[in-house]
């Protein structure tokens, strides 16, 4: 799928342009104002700021890891001339930014006082909007008459989870491949059943430089048969110990791959030579 048609050239424009308008419509009807707080490894931040710019009832604050997003995306976030948009550089990784955001939302008193809301894929509206293009793509590719598979470059697991949710809704998807870069915790988990945290390594695909994928909890919820207490226990143990292992972990129709920085330029060159089509480093991680 070509998902670079939005104003910031990120696939997240498809969902966030809708979500920004939904926020504006509902808030105006209610006479309310919200403070949106989000974390980004690059593409979410620029797409969210663009979607919320100049919205009268929204203040948006986006945290990004200093020196770990692409120069283009940093400029997209920091050069918007809009009084309600705020981009904040954090000394750390995307996971550090995400932990700060989660901490704010977990502080009930602070959350209510500031009327916090989210545009990250923590917000279910983001995932719902992304389900749509999987349905459209599958139908155009011949579903249900022919099996359709998707290989998805994956960082925070929101996009590929939208594909999985589409399958759960009845879309005849044959296979989903979770493409990772050198920050390969998801690849290792699908291969071994063990989640084991490592340091975040800067790569040629910076929007995927993530170790703890928020949306993976949603997949675990289904794997653990809807037992939310069990999911909480697993994730708390994982965050405190840095690892968690399942016996016989398997998600039907899902697998994973890992692409290193050495392989990314080779894949880009091979795709160009064979198809005369130029893919970006993130797409290369799922090719």
Predicted region positions:
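PLP-dependent amino-acid enzyme catalytic core
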Residues: 1-287
């Amino acid at each position: 799928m070509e998902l670079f048609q939005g104003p910031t050239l990120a696939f997240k424009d498809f969902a966030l342009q809708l979500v920004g308008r939904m926020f504006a419509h509902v808030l105006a009807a209610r006479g309310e104002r919200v403070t949106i707080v989000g974390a980004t490894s690059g593409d979410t931040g620029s797409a969210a700021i663009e979607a919320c710019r100049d919205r009268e009832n929204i203040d948006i604050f986006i945290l990004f890891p200093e020196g770990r997003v692409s120069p283009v995306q940093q400029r997209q976030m920091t050069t918007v001339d809009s009084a309600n948009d705020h981009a904040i550089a954090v000394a750390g990784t995307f996971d550090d930014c995400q932990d700060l955001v989660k901490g704010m939302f977990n502080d009930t008193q602070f959350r209510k006082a500031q009327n916090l809301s989210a545009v990250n894929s923590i917000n279910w509206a983001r995932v719902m909007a992304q389900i749509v293009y999987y349905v459209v793509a599958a139908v155009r590719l011949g579903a249900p008459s022919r099996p359709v598979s998707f290989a998805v470059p994956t960082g925070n697991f929101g996009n590929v989870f939208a594909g999985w949710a589409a399958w759960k809704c009845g879309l005849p998807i044959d296979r989903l491949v979770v493409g990772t870069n050198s920050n390969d915790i998801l690849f290792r988990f699908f291969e071994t059943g063990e989640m084991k945290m490592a340091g975040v390594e800067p790569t040629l695909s910076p929007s995927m430089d993530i170790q703890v994928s928020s949306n993976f909890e949603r997949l675990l919820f289904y794997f653990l048969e809807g037992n939310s207490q069990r999911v909480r226990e697993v994730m708390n143990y994982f965050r405190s110990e840095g690892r968690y292992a399942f016996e016989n972990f398997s998600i039907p129709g899902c697998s994973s791959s890992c692409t290193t920085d050495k392989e990314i330029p080779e894949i880009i060159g091979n795709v160009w030579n064979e198809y005369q089509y130029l893919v970006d480093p993130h797409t290369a991680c799922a090719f």
